[in-house]
Amino acid sequence: KIYQVGGAVRDEMLGKVSKDLDLLVVGVELNKLAKILKPFGKVNMVGKAFGIIKFKPERSEEDIDISVPRIDSKSTGKGHRDFEVKLGKGITLQQDQLRRDFWMNALAKDVETGEIHDVEGQGKVDIENQQVRVIGPQAFKDDPLRMLRAVQFAARFDFSIEPNTLDQIKKNVRLIKTISADRFQEEFRKMFEKGTPSIGVNYLKETGILRQLFPKSSGNFPIEFDKLDKKAFPAFLAILLKEHSFTDIQKKMRLSNEDARAVSEVMYYMAMTDTGKQEDSEIGLVHFVGQTSAKGISNVEAVLSVTRKTPISNRLKMMKRAGKPTSMKELGIGGRDLVKLGLKGKKIGDALQFSLDHAIESGNNDPKYLLDTVKSKFGVK
């Protein structure tokens, strides 16, 4: 028997389109299944320990996860990456369903008949009641990441977390710190990009997950997360974890270099504007833009949009209309002009920076005026 399992069945019942295709084949050993599939495409046994085959059919660009039923017990190893797994031809569909995290994720659809198999109707009930409910009392001890997944699913589908499940998370919340960092990032990202972030953030606070992972978090946030652009994940993290250092965040999240830099740039901008320093001035703004990545700028712009402050791009346009340079490229003089004055080495860079700041402050970008100012400042005769 072949069944479609996992999120795709849940999403179908929610009326959502899913790109996932996970199949479960009952009544056959894994190795025999691999032999059956081999003539029809590429078989990858990378998930053999978990009873999973990655199968790419001929003329297809996408892999399909095809598995045999299994029974999991608690996760083991560093970061809880490994499970104690039992495979076997005699394991039933229902046994496989009961190993899953939440009832709404334990649905199985008969590929041949279209019939939905739901243990005691629990999954359908939870979807109708719009709630996330854990299957067994050991679920969070077996895999602590499920606590964060419960929050992620609640945010993603605008669901509530069933009261008993919520209590179980609170009782086991300390175990969340045993999970490896890269597994956190995926759940936080889904919570923000695919759901209603405020629901997730409220549950992170209520369950104690936020305090366990980031002890300095006050739980007070200056913006409405739901209004943030969905591409602004670094901005979301920078605001959610604003009391923490960038190093703390990167240690817990293991972000890509690009995202990590953007988080640090948003945090820097927020810190400077909160104290009324540099970035509130035109000079400070130009300095910031000149040192910041494109992704950092777009994430700062996302924050400014939500807080209804003037976008960086608009401020730069106003400066240009006033005849002020917004970068070294727009400065009325260049390095060659300073060499002709007799300046060398570091003094050239210092003089250029001085000229840029002075042109912005004075509103005068005239080359002769700037060269005369440099002569006076740097003692050139």
Question: Where are the regions a protein language model picked out?
Answer:
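Catalytic cores of the polymerase beta-like nucleotidyltransferase superfamily
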Residues: 1-381
